[in-house]
A protein has these predicted regions:
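Glycine-rich flexible loops
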Residues: 1-238
Length: 238
């Protein structure tokens, strides 16, 4: 069942290791088949070097395990909540990459300080609130998804304009049209978090530093890559 999608999800998960976004068995990637109402996700706690495409677990969008000999990722309810809240999302990645986690642990949005960030997201990457004790001791992973969705909705942000949210004291979740785009966004997020950290470090030692991107420059860079009249890259005909 969903053999092609399982292969894609497997390959996307292996990219987490290739890009050094995870260590040990941390992290997970999933992808959804909207027509069939199913999604595929990495199994829980399986070493990347021992994992195969056949190990990927098929879940329904109502939360039932449909196929797989292994348990799905413990973060499955988070992925499920995001797929159900945002139909435009086709793939989700969760990592514990160092720089993104540092910002999450600090409970800070990642400001847009330059055009690299603007090419990725149309504004600051939000850091969602921490979960309450009741939320943690209840359906923790499901509530994590609800907190992410709450953050986007409360700020009036489209998930495709801001393809990442940090969860306070936890880490980053990213998404995209497919699992490979979700992983790409996780990689870009790690880089912009690193750049933002270094920018603030430099600025702390120089009172004349001028940090923060102008709105018109941010908008230009975002729209030329992602807007209706985007002209970055090659057309589909090329």
């Amino acid at each position: 069942m969903l053999e092609e999608l399982k292969q894609k999800v497997y390959e996307a998960n292996m990219q987490l290791k290739e890009y050094e976004l995870v260590v040990l068995t941390w992290g997970n990637v999933s992808a959804v088949d909207r027509k069939k109402g199913l999604f595929v996700i990495k199994p829980s706690g399986v070493p990347y070097d021992k994992m195969t495409a056949d190990d990927m677990v098929v879940m329904s969008l109502t939360g039932e395990k449909i196929e797989g000999k292994l348990n799905p990722s413990s973060d499955t309810p988070t992925h499920l909540e995001l797929y159900n809240r945002f139909p435009e999302i086709g793939g989700i990645a969760h990592t514990h990459s160092s720089w993104a986690c540092a910002w999450a642990q600090a409970g800070r949005d990642v400001p847009a300080y330059g055009t690299t960030h603007a090419d990725f997201a149309n504004g600051a990457v939000p850091c969602a609130r921490g979960l309450t004790e009741v939320e943690v001791n209840g359906e923790y992973e499901l509530n994590t998804g609800k907190v992410i969705a709450e953050e986007l909705e409360s700020r009036g942000i489209s998930p495709l304009e801001r393809p990442a949210v940090l969860v306070h004291r936890h880490g980053p979740f990213t998404w995209g049209k497919d699992p490979f785009k979700a992983v790409e966004n996780a990689l870009i997020l790690e880089e912009v978090c690193k750049m933002a950290s270094r920018t603030e470090r430099i600025a702390a030692f120089d009172k004349d530093s001028d940090i923060g991107i102008e709105e018109y420059l941010l908008e230009k860079h975002y729209q030329r890559k992602h807007g209706k009249n985007a002209y970055y890259g090659q057309s589909e005909e090329n």
